[in-house]
Amino acid sequence: MRNEQTVRIRLGIALLVAVTCALAAAAQDKNSFTPMALDSGFGHMDLAAPAVPPEQIIHQFAARESEFQQALNHYTFRRTARVQTIDDDNKVDGEWYEVDDVIFDPNGKRTEKVVYAPGSSLQRVQMSPSDLQDIQRGYSFALTTEEIAHYNVKYVGRQKVDEIDCYVFDVAPKVIEKKMRYLQGRIWVDATDLQIVVTNGRMVPDDTRKNNEDLHPPFMTWRQQVDGHYWFPVYTKGEGILHFSGGSGYMAQDVHIRDTVKYTDYKQFGSTFKIIYDGQEIAPPAEQPNAQQKK
């Protein structure tokens, strides 16, 4: 998310200066990150060591996440995203809204179709490419076997989430590479299905360079079982105060941001894809139910 004042200044100097500094080189204010608050559905955290070594749990759930990602890649769904700015009276004073269908073209290639996208009324901030990247991919984070090599994963404990027994892990990127987005935060993994059911954190990096700030709020994503086997993202909420520093020609500004993303209408595409769950082929369900969304 870019400060609208900063955007105006940058447009004025764009012909004079080429921004070549890599996003990965921007300094990160780690102390500014406050995760989303947990509701009453999160029970007591058991900090005792698990019966199974954490490394084994991590290996198993990463493999299951890979299976989930493969399954998700063969589903169509609708994504409804809303980004709002909130004033000092806790009222919405600007909004960006878009409805997209994630579908397949006639050649079977995965693509996105904009269903509805009214003009943005955001005044104090402007949507950046990284905001769109987070909405399209980051908020539905999956920690697969391929991705886990890029993360430090630390076992925290065991906790129930709405009666689901979960292992809890803290995750953070080992190295931030140019043009890449990573999760920094915490995940809850179903102790039976070994799949992520809740993600709480933020996507990094933030760009903190003056006249080029690009900041992002913390978020939580909930998953639910959609096909009877895998846990699919159904709802994301992000909220926080973005602290934009002052610069040449503009003042410092704090902007209250609220994001919501809903994922609905999951449907399996085609008939040639095989659902593999725990190493076994599963017959596809006759009908895909719409997952109930967490409010």
Region roles according to the model:
Residues 12-22:
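Bacterial N-terminal signal peptides
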Residues 28-184, 191-198, 202-217, 225-233, ...:
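Structured extracytoplasmic
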Residues 23-27:
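Sec/Tat signal peptide C-region and signal peptidase I cleavage site
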Residues 6, 16-18, 56, 124:
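Detector for intrinsically disordered, low-structure N-terminal pre-sequences
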Residues 2-13:
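Bacterial N-terminal signal peptides that target proteins for export
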